[in-house]
Each structure stands twice: as C-alpha cells, then as structure tokens.
Amino acid sequence: MSIKTVKDFSSFAGKRALVRCDFNVPLKEGSISDDTRIRAALSTIEYLKERGARIVLVSHLGRPDGKKNSKYSLKPVANRLSELLGQDVKMLSDCIGSEVVNSTLQMKDGDVVLLENVRFYAEEEKNDKNFAKKLSENGDVFVNDAFGAAHRAHASTVGVADYLPSVGGFLMEKEDKFLGGILKNPERPFVSIIGGSKVSSKIAVLESLLSKSNVVVIGGGMAYTFLHSEGYSIGKSLLEDEYIGIASSFLKKAKELGVKVILPLDHIVADDFNKNSIPEYINSFNIPENKIGMDIGANTLKEIEKVVKTAKTIIWNGPLGVFEFDSFSKGTAKVAEMVASCSGLTVVGGGDSVAAVNKFNLSDKITHVSTGGGASLEYLEGRILPGIKVLEN
C-alpha cells in the first residue's frame, strides 16, 4: 500500500508543518561527526519552504531516559541546519508548552525552527496521548520524514497523527519505494547479501528474503553457525548453539525452493579476536580448532562476484567480516566495490553495511542507501512499521 506524501497535501502556504525528522546523529565532544541524517531531511524541508510553509522540526537524539540533559540537546543540529539551509534555524528551549506554541504561531512563511529533544519527556516513548496532543499544537499538518524511527510507535512518530492531517516526507517515500519494491516485485536475478555477527538478529530477515531471492549470500560472524550446522569445523569462531537447528532448517528450505546459498568456502582467520591479530589464510571450509574466523577469503569473493555481476537487484545488509579491524575489512570492502559496480538496482540497508559503504566512499554508486538501521531491518523482515502505517492511503 502506498503512503500519502507532501505532494498529496493541497496547500502548505501559511501553515505550520510539524516535521518529524531523524536527527539522531553521532556527537563527539558536542560536535556532529556525521551529518548524513541531517542532509537526508533537506529535500523535504526545501520543498516545504518553497511552498510557504512555516517549518517546525521535531526529533530525538540519543537516550536521555525521559529527563532533560544538555548532553543530548539538539542545539548542534540547529547550528548545522542553519549552515546547510543558509538561513537562521531558531532553536526552541522545549518541545511542548504555551511558550513553544506561541513561538510557532509568530513564525513567517519559510521560517524554520527546531524543537528541543522529544525524548526529554518519558511520555514520548510511551506514545502518551496527552503528550502527543500537546506536541501537535505546534503544527497544522504533520509530516513524518523519520524513517529511522518508523519502527517505533512513539508520540512524535505515531501519536500526533491522531490530531493532525498526516503525510510522509521525501525520505520516507524513498525508503518505502525501494525497500517495499524489493519485497513486492524485485527484478531478477535477485541476490540477497546478509552479513553481521549473529544469526539471532538476522534470521527473520533471511527467512523473509529467502522465498524472494535467487541467491542468498551469508557472511560475517553468523556464517560460522551455518557452517557448523553443515558439519564443518569452525575452530574458536562465533557459534550460537541454540540456532544450529534453525540454520540447518533454513539451508534445507533453500534447497527445496531452489535458492542458491553461498557460505564462506575459505577464510581469513586469527589466533584471537583483536585488531592487532595477524591475519592468516585458510583455503578450506574448515577452520583449525585454535583459530577464529574473521573474514571471507578470495575464493568466496570470486563466488560472490559471479552472482553480483549478473544480478538485476541486490539487497545488502551487514558486513561480511570484522570490518572495523582494518586487517579483516578486505572482504567487506571488496563486496562493497562489487555492489557499487553492479548495473542493477542496489540497496544497502542496516547501520554497519551503510558505515562500510561510507567508509570506502561508495555511497554515490549505490541506487539507495537506507538511513534506517533497525527500521530497515524490521521492514525487510516483512513487519508493519507503525510510523508508515499511519501515513497509508
């Protein structure tokens, strides 16, 4: 089902648009270390400005546990937005209350203000009706552009929609289009590349994508549980005992469906899990008993390259090795390059794989880099996201 977007709203002129963004950006000593999420909101903000809206931005930042805490103030975001938009973005000292409402009522067309962190109130995460109503008094129309928080049924993502006409912003529309398109009708061959450390956090995504994929590539720490389930020795590598049976059932089901599964057939290993460990190549499915699997090997990469070259659609979620350690990042880097050079539709979702694509400066060569970590994952699991549901036609 498609969502209503800003393009479906008749007129923004003179109206206060309460825009829920995802400005949950990383801060280092009070400075923003990565402004990707702020830039992602600009197209919606510019669109509303051009149409004479009075823009009231709302977001969370970090986990202040329902208490005011200057460490989690959105002030650095207001400063960065002022630079990016080339106009003063006024930072308000709160997100609800008569003083805040009066400030929004005195705005002129094209003005932009930012409310203080909604998570300074415990009621936000409880989706408290009274809090949502107070928040809604800052707008005449609600625009949700916070895909990264769409899997949370909070007051600022879901609750306010009970009190205001509600539409999605361009970022929300884009995420819904690309991730939804992959689940509904992918062009084939469709290759799913799923990495990450734990089967427990990725099995739902794997099961959701299995029936839709032609090929599933499994890498990262979770691959060792799959290898173990097939009878291979994995040394001291990560193993989730309670998921061995589930991994085995998954591989059996893939066989029944005629879906090719690529598991690591060679490895880069180390004596221990340490960034300074010496990498060693093992040309076998089996890992010696005193070694830990840390990355995929050259033969595995060749197998992946074969399927990526001919793919018409690729979804990649999760790194294929311990990419945060430089000595064990080559597998993930090579896969990032392969995905970037694929001529088909490519979507990268999930925090770590997005970080990998950014680390290797390849994001502009990917069709769509998802901004939602947990939200992307839940969407790909086939779950209904509350923040999207309230925007459906």
Curated annotation (Swiss-Prot):
GO biological process entries: gluconeogenesis; glycolytic process
Taxonomic superkingdom: Bacteria
Subcellular location: Cytoplasm
Residues reported to bind ATP: K202, G293, E324, G350, G351, D352, S353
GO molecular function: ADP binding; ATP binding; phosphoglycerate kinase activity
Transmembrane segments: none
Amino-acid positions noted as binding substrate in the UniProt annotation, renumbered to this chain: D22, F23, N24, R37, H60, L61, G62, R63, R119, R152
Keyword Repeat: no
Keywords from the named record: ATP-binding, Cytoplasm, Glycolysis, Kinase, Nucleotide-binding, Transferase
GO cellular component, one term: cytosol
Reaction catalysed by this enzyme: (2R)-3-phosphoglycerate + ATP = (2R)-3-phospho-glyceroyl phosphate + ADP
Chief subcellular location: cytoplasm
Pfam assignment, any one: PGK
EC number: 2.7.2.3
Parts forming coiled coils: none
Pathway assigned in UniProt: Carbohydrate degradation; glycolysis; pyruvate from D-glyceraldehyde 3-phosphate: step 2/5
Gene3D superfamilies: Phosphoglycerate kinase, N-terminal domain
Homology family: Belongs to the phosphoglycerate kinase family.
Protein name: Phosphoglycerate kinase
